Amino acid sequence: MIAVITTLLTYYMSSNNLITLLIAIEILLLTVTLKLIHISGYYDDIYGTIFSLIIIILAGAESAIGLSILVAYYRLRGTIGHSI
């Protein structure tokens, strides 16, 4: 719950910066993954840990793709801001 509130607060405080929005989404995904690791360790379940590892790998690929899209957007427009 705290991760969702923190992510929404970060988005509200910097709503015109796409890089900060990408970082806020990654923090939310990492928080959910860490909670999944904690729960799978509590119940002694290996599948939750494996699933968490897959989520972390996919999050790394997602952030690399998102950052490359932002770099291409910056080269095209000259700014990284957006408007709601």
From Swiss-Prot:
Cell compartment(s), UniProt: Mitochondrion membrane
Family from the record: Belongs to the complex I subunit 4L family.
Gene3D superfamilies hit by this protein: 1.10.287.3510
Single GO cellular component term: mitochondrial membrane
Lineage of the organism: Eukaryota, Fungi, Dikarya, Ascomycota, Saccharomycotina
Function, in words: Core subunit of the mitochondrial membrane respiratory chain NADH dehydrogenase (Complex I) that is believed to belong to the minimal assembly required for catalysis. Complex I functions in the transfer of electrons from NADH to the respiratory chain. The immediate electron acceptor for the enzyme is believed to be ubiquinone.
EC numbers, comma separated: 7.1.1.2
Protein name: NADH-ubiquinone oxidoreductase chain 4L
Any single biological process term in GO: mitochondrial electron transport, NADH to ubiquinone
Keyword Transmembrane: yes
Membrane topology reported for the UniProt record: Multi-pass membrane protein
Record Pfam families: Oxidored_q2
